Amino acid sequence: LYIVGRGVEWEITPALWTIVIVTMLVGTVGGIVQSDVKRMLAYSSIAHAGFVLIGVSAFHSAAIEAVAFYLLAYGLASVGAFGVVALVRERAEGAGIVGEATALDRWRGLGRKDPFLAGAMAIFLLSFAGIPLTGGFIGKFQVFAAGIEGGLAVLVVLAVLASAATAFFYFRLILMMFFQEPDDYAVPVASEGYSAVAIGVCAVGTLLLGIVPGPLMNFLGEAKAFML
């Protein structure tokens, strides 16, 4: 879009602004009212799409690496989060495991039942919220900085407010996992294949992108220079 949109920015800017605002609003409000983990993550992805589009709408070269970094950081955390969801199952009374425990209430006390899964999920949620020392923080900072540089200060302010609002449902789940009594019908299952390994890699990668983002940012900058 950076290459194709150059020269017609003013014509497509109103449409992009509308899409950005609508996606952030729908993702934020939808996520807040959810009581299902998978649906919460789905609405979260809508809000994050709005954040990414701020960088896309900036129409300058610095935004390219910011958007690429954001997508990599978000993708890493998303893969890990859905991996955790797949390993938290629901047990019916008097029966065996009946499926994934996607209801938020089923995640109460997960930190006591399986510290690894709960800890990894907390890392991914903190990254989604843009908390420092995670890849999500660096990604949001870079994209929002690119937006300000591109003259999109109003959108960035709205995005910061939306990001603060989305943090509510991320921290809600973290508090449920670590500060509430365990749910009797939620059962963390043993890793199937390399699921636990993948979750661990995603968690470590999410932290590394937040602590030492320089190597990836340098690589993306060189790749951008090569392509342009």
For the regions a protein language model found, what residue spans apply to each?
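Alpha-helical transmembrane segments of multi-pass membrane proteins predominantly involved
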Residues: 1-228
